[in-house]
Amino acid sequence: MATGKIVQVIGAVVDVEFPQDAVPRVYDALEVQNGNEKLVLEVQQQLGGGIVRTIAMGSSDGLRRGLDVKDLEHPIEVPVGKATLGRIMNVLGEPVDMKGEIGEEERWAIHRAAPSYEELSNSQELLETGIKVIDLMCPFAKGGKVGLFGGAGVGKTVNMMELIRNIAIEHSGYSVFAGVGERTREGNDFYHEMTDSNVIDKVSLVYGQMNEPPGNRLRVALTGLTMAEKFRDEGRDVLLFVDNIYRYTLAGTEVSALLGRMPSAVGYQPTLAEEMGVLQERITSTKTGSITSVQAVYVPADDLTDPSPATTFAHLDATVVLSRQIASLGIYPAVDPLDSTSRQLDPLVVGQEHYDTARGVQSILQRYQELKDIIAILGMDELSEEDKLVVARARKIQRFLSQPFFVAEVFTGSPGKYVSLKDTIRGFKGIMEGEYDHLPEQAFYMVGSIDEAVEKAKKL
């Protein structure tokens, strides 16, 4: 095992000099004793003359020139397999939940090649989430990739928590949650939410929070992905949740600047598309098992054309766009039914009835959107009878797209609801065909199935 010495420390970037005949490879892990702590560095560049430039995976406070650094001669390796379920780990796969050692049987390197073309498989099977607006407007494919797009505070994390809860309870699958650069408080809430729902023993949690150095936040997504790949290669259908993919890009920007690369548009790293591709190409389904991934994507200043969300769009099968405008109406989940898309919304995949219902709902909401200006200027009375009916139905549909969540019972005060796809289609079809024209629109707000709306109307 070769040993080198630190020659320069600039924040999270540490330069280490090794003997010329024992220079570590790019992505190799190095270890340095920093006081009582062991710090892991990852090689990013070979500068020549035996010097390598590395990124610290933890705080570089207290490092000084001349300290001895060991080359571990392999990339960062993390525990994989069933031993990781129910545990909280950091980027290096070390437990941070005070429950002792992981006791894993196997460790895998976090840098791995994506599956080859022959190994890939294509599935048309739908994954029911129990969330009406998602199942109807932007259905998820088993083994597909989904992005939850939204600005600050419109409900990305809450939606993600609800998805994990529903899928873990209703589908009893394994999940891996990678918290990339999010708030520590959210990670804590998340852990307790999973424990309260009794699904913690089916989830592996990997956290690299906002206060961690950029190298840590850049690699934590790969740590989570490696654990998911192991479950997939055992022949399971696994779910990978990444919250938040934007912070992964942001960490890449910070690392890129520290390594002295020239920034590109809006200050992002020049390797943005490649870094995103390296991660996304590994999140895929093979003939052995599937990885279905749900990724929260923070949209800076609500601008979907920003390079980071725009690069992410290219990799996704379904996009769930959360809208501040809908959230401000008090309709949660604040999914925009006109902006959200899915490759699965195709009559050959979902069936003609589902397709027609979804498109019908969209056209009614679109017409309502167009009529809003007329209503604002001239009032409802100036509309034709036909348009008045469209507006009434659109307002009912809009309210019926809301739903009480299990993980948000504390906020809404009403018990969470899981709605099957069959009930969802039946409800929206009924509203469009005028079966419920006699019910007041308040009856449709924050209910599960259409039968609950009918019951609620009796009490109003």
Swiss-Prot record:
Q: What is catalysed by this protein?
A: ATP + H2O + 4 H(+)(in) = ADP + phosphate + 5 H(+)(out)
**Protein EC:** 7.1.2.2
GO-annotated molecular function: ATP binding; ATP hydrolysis activity; proton-transporting ATP synthase activity, rotational mechanism
Tell me which InterPro entries the record gives: AAA+_ATPase, ATP-synt_VA_C, ATP_synth_F1_bsu, ATPase_a/bsu_AS, ATPase_alpha/beta_chains, ATPase_F1/V1/A1_a/bsu_N, ATPase_F1/V1/A1_a/bsu_N_sf, ATPase_F1/V1/A1_a/bsu_nucl-bd
* Top enzyme category: translocase
Cited PANTHER family = ATP SYNTHASE, ATP SYNTHASE SUBUNIT BETA, MITOCHONDRIAL
Would you tell me the protein name for this molecule?
Answer: ATP synthase subunit beta
Question: What's a single GO CC term here?
Answer: proton-transporting ATP synthase complex
Q: Known Pfam families for this protein?
A: ATP-synt_ab, ATP-synt_ab_N, ATP-synt_VA_C
- Please give the chief subcellular localization of this protein: membrane
The alphabetical list of record keywords is:
ATP synthesis, ATP-binding, Cell inner membrane, Cell membrane, CF(1), Hydrogen ion transport, Ion transport, Membrane, Nucleotide-binding, Translocase, Transport
Q: Could you tell me the membrane topology recorded for this protein?
A: Peripheral membrane protein
UniProt function note = Produces ATP from ADP in the presence of a proton gradient across the membrane. The catalytic sites are hosted primarily by the beta subunits.
Taxonomic lineage is: Bacteria, Pseudomonadati, Pseudomonadota, Gammaproteobacteria, Enterobacterales
